[in-house]
A protein has these predicted regions:
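Conserved S-adenosyl-L-methionine
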Residues: 77
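Class I (Rossmann-like) S-adenosyl-L-methionine-dependent methyltransferase catalytic domain
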Residues: 1-70, 80-128, 148, 152, ...
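Short amphipathic alpha-helix with an adjacent loop that forms part of the alpha/beta core around
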Residues: 131-134
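A short glycine-rich, Lys/Arg-flanked "PGG" loop and its adjoining helix->strand segment in the class I
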Residues: 154-166
Length: 239
């Protein structure tokens, strides 16, 4: 690749992450009192209405039932901590980490720390996680990888795999989705405007994870036929 092309690619990537940061800063500002203004019951009802929440929680429960020795975990790109809180509801976790690149988002969670048992929040970069290899028995990264620039996807998967000791639970936007063209050309531009959404093939992801010494354990989506769903949650077990 010519030097000018590399330069253009790097500039395009920097602009992408700048737009992502601005998007989530605005989102954080809009939700600054998310936990403070809600009772536990109202919060639970609101989360259960979200399209993927049942998939998230049932997948987590299946992991925990299959291995009774999981005692620590990390929620990477935790945002304001919705799923971090879900992890903390399981008393077996002695240590939970929530990490996000934007302090404004997890500050929403920190304001109500009583809702997060055995949990600490840190600011950090998914592409350069500040943890030793195999630090966490369960690593979770949900509703995030579609915001990672296509040139950084391999690096993101490597970092998530590197810090994982047992199980990695991740979500992707699926290139094998049956209505992919309609979704990417019509629906997403209206929702995200100038913010690109990067999708990935579950089949290619499975091969990549095998190279990182992980095998597919669970696959669930937001439609009946999982592998053709737009949003996919995959759990990989280290071998």
């Amino acid at each position: 690749m010519k030097r000018s092309n590399v330069y253009d690619s790097e500039n395009e990537k920097k602009l992408h992450y700048k737009n992502v940061k601005n998007y989530f800063k605005k989102s954080a500002a809009d939700k600054c009192g998310f936990y403070e203004l809600k009772s536990e019951e109202k919060l639970e009802r609101e989360l259960k209405k979200r399209s993927m929440w049942k998939v998230y929680t049932s997948t987590l429960n299946e992991i925990l039932k299959s291995d009774l020795n999981i005692s620590n975990g990390i929620d990477v790109a935790c945002g304001m901590g919705n799923f971090t809180r879900e992890l903390s509801k399981h008393k077996r976790f002695q240590n939970i980490i929530g990490i996000d690149f934007l302090k404004e988002t997890f500050d929403i969670a920190i304001k109500t720390k009583n809702k997060f048992l055995n949990t600490s929040f840190f600011q950090g970069d998914l592409l350069n996680l500040p943890f030793k290899d195999s630090s966490f028995e369960l690593t979770v990264c949900l509703n995030t990888l579609h915001h990672i620039h296509k040139n950084d996807f391999l690096k993101a998967i490597y970092e998530l795999s590197r810090v994982t000791k047992k199980y990695l639970m991740i979500e992707i936007r699926n290139k094998n989705y049956i209505f992919y063209s309609w979704k990417t050309k019509i629906v997403l531009p209206r929702l995200y405007k100038d913010l690109p959404i990067y999708s990935n093939s579950i089949f290619k992801l499975n091969k990549l994870m095998e190279k990182n010494n992980f095998k597919l354990k669970i696959l669930r989506g937001n439609s009946v036929i999982s592998f053709s769903s737009w949003r996919l949650v995959a759990v990989y077990e280290k071998f």
